[in-house]
Amino acid sequence: MTEHADNITERARKIRLLILDCDGVLTDGRIIMLPGGDETKAFDVKDGHAMVMAQRAGLRIAIISGRQSSVVRARAKELGVAHLFEMAWVKTEPYEKVLAEEELNDEAVCYVGDDVVDIPLLRRAGLAVAVADAVEETKEYSHIVTTRRGGRGAVREVIQLILKAQGKWDEAMSHDLG
């Protein structure tokens, strides 16, 4: 389901917390297993830069992942992500925890997901977003679907939407323009 643009803008204006799934949202969903059991993942630099811009503009960010990964921990630390939850197969528990810590309600949350495990949070979020290559069931529970795929700029697209709706995009960009 995709809502009218005015309704999306109104929802985006209320967002104070961006919660992201990891595999399939921050990455393309592929996990490359290396000899010895280590793994690697690829992150889009534009997504990361937008996350830094968003935080400078006052948007809080959390990542909730169903897996555990030193690569994700390192990336979250590098980007200054406030909340990282791993091994969260049931994502409602960390969702409730971060809302309590940030003293926010569902309306102030944008959640971005790609698979059926994300549906419970998409149902609750003030702005529910599925990435372009999300499974169809996930798209059905989203207010919008990005034009970009997970791990390929979808997060930047969402952040740009939120910051523009809040009138903060130009200011966020000005830091990098000098």
Protein language model features and the residues they cover:
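Short coil/turn segments at beta-strand junctions that form active-site/ligand-binding loops
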Residues: 14-16, 59, 107-108
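Asp-based phosphoryl-transfer active-site loop
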Residues: 12-31, 122, 155
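Substrate-recognition element of Asp-dependent hydrolases with the DxDx(T/V) motif
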Residues: 51-75, 85-86
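Mg2+-dependent phosphoryl-transfer enzymes with acidic/Ser/Thr/Gly-rich catalytic loops
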Residues: 37-41, 78-79, 83-85, 92-178
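Non-catalytic pre-domain segments flanking phosphatase-related domains
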Residues: 1-20, 168-178
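Short, basic/glycine-rich phosphate-binding loops at helix/coil junctions
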Residues: 27-33, 73-79
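Basic, amphipathic juxtamembrane/active-site segments
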Residues: 2, 16, 30-53
